[in-house]
């Protein structure tokens, strides 16, 4: 029973808890399988020792980091906001548009669960519009839902998670013309190499989210950023928490951009491994495989229960994510992928291929 001074609607929500299996191959969180190089970790340790006074708050407006992000993305510094992971920026965008009964949040589902979760924790109405059978977006259906439900912010992951597919240019152009804030979440940009950044100057209602948690290997540091026209960026600065990004996280993100030629050099291997897993899974008639432009694959068992398959793979040491009636499989190291392939082969008999 909830205490009387707590919001009763929170009683139905579940706290987010990630599973912990230290001995298993972690292919369930879309992290890059490679840690930072040892020399870069040593550099961060040196920067922590020389440049961070732990008794002082971190820089509240990290101008150097914003300038580095702006240079990387081809925008100006006043178009950049940084956050404690993209989650904080999603929360700030909802706060800036919908709080106090002023509007509804929308997205096309299945998709990244935090759009819904963060709206619900803020007591903001959320509408999830169903994707098509192949997980595309029906612009007519989405536009009608936006118009009929008082939507003020529309979140679209591009590529989408858990399905890995990109929106077409035509869909982006059409949805960008809607009279709402349109947020394109490009968390996997470095793998897809598709970005709507050039549209920022044409569409003042467009916001792009990105992260250092995936291709840049900094998931532990929780650094996300938003790109938007300066007016929207200025509002996001008003609603963010003070000192929201720890000093070491700022240094890590700056160093990652400084050495991006080294860190991003791992991406061709990840994409090659993704294609290798795709070729293997395509041989199984009982598995429906979907095209991906990210560092993961989405597969849907045609007959077997997806949760039973997930549990069986976990029992064999390969952790994958159950989602949307299927399985999301992160591309790991070649050795991890070898074990995944062997584990899948062990679960499906030859006649099921």
From Swiss-Prot:
User: Which terms in the Gene Ontology molecular function aspect does this entry carry?
Assistant: histidinol-phosphate transaminase activity; pyridoxal phosphate binding
Domain of life of the organism in this record?
Answer: Bacteria
Q: Which Gene3D superfamilies match?
A: Aspartate Aminotransferase, domain 1, Type I PLP-dependent aspartate aminotransferase-like (Major domain)
Q: List UniProt keywords, sorted A-Z.
A: Amino-acid biosynthesis, Aminotransferase, Histidine biosynthesis, Pyridoxal phosphate, Transferase
| Pathway terms, separated by semicolons | Amino-acid biosynthesis; L-histidine biosynthesis; L-histidine from 5-phospho-alpha-D-ribose 1-diphosphate: step 7/9
The N6-(pyridoxal phosphate)lysine modification is found at 214
EC assignment: the record states 2.6.1.9
State the needed cofactors, names only.
pyridoxal 5'-phosphate
Per the record, what are the reactions this protein catalyses?
L-histidinol phosphate + 2-oxoglutarate = 3-(imidazol-4-yl)-2-oxopropyl phosphate + L-glutamate
GO BP term, pick one: L-histidine biosynthetic process
Q: Which family would the database say this protein is a member of? A: Belongs to the class-II pyridoxal-phosphate-dependent aminotransferase family. Histidinol-phosphate aminotransferase subfamily.
Quaternary arrangement and interactors, per the entry?
Answer: Homodimer.
Q: Which named protein is this?
A: Histidinol-phosphate aminotransferase
Source organism of this protein record: Gloeobacter violaceus (strain ATCC 29082 / PCC 7421)
This protein's gene is called: hisC
């Amino acid at each position: 029973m909830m205490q009387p001074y707590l919001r009763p609607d929170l009683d139905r929500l579940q706290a987010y808890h990630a599973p912990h299996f230290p001995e298993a191959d972690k292919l369930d969180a879309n992290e890059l399988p490679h840690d930072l190089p040892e020399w870069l970790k040593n550099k961060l340790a040196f920067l922590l020792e020389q440049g961070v006074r732990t008794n002082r708050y971190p820089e509240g407006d990290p101008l150097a980091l914003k300038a580095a992000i702006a240079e990387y993305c081809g925008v100006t510094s006043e178009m950049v906001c940084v956050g404690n992971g993209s989650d904080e920026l999603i929360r700030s965008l909802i706060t800036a548009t919908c709080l106090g009964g002023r509007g509804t949040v929308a997205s096309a589902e299945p998709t990244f669960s935090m759009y819904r979760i963060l709206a619900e924790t803020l007591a903001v109405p959320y509408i999830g519009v169903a994707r098509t059978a192949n997980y595309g977006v029906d612009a007519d259906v989405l536009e009608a839902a936006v118009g009929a439900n008082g939507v003020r912010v529309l979140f679209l992951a591009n590529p989408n998670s858990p399905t890995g597919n990109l929106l077409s240019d035509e869909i982006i152009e059409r949805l960008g013309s809607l009279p709402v804030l349109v947020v394109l979440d490009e968390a996997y940009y470095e793998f897809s190499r598709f970005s709507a950044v050039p549209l920022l100057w044409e569409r003042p209602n467009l916001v792009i989210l990105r992260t250092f948690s995936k291709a840049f290997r900094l998931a532990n540091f929780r650094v996300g950023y938003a790109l938007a026209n300066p007016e929207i960026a200025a509002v996001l600065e008003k609603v963010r928490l003070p000192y929201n990004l720890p000093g070491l996280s700022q240094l890590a993100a700056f160093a990652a951009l400084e050495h991006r030629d080294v860190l991003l050099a791992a991406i061709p291997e990840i994409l090659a491994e993704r294609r290798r897993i795709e070729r293997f899974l395509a041989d199984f008639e009982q598995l429906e495989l979907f095209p991906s432009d990210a560092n993961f694959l989405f597969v849907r068992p045609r007959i077997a229960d997806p949760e039973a398959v997930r549990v069986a793979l976990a029992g064999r040491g390969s952790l994958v994510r159950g989602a949307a009636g299927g399985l999301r499989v992160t591309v790991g190291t070649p050795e991890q992928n070898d074990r995944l392939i062997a584990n899948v082969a062990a679960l499906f008999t030859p006649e099921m291929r």
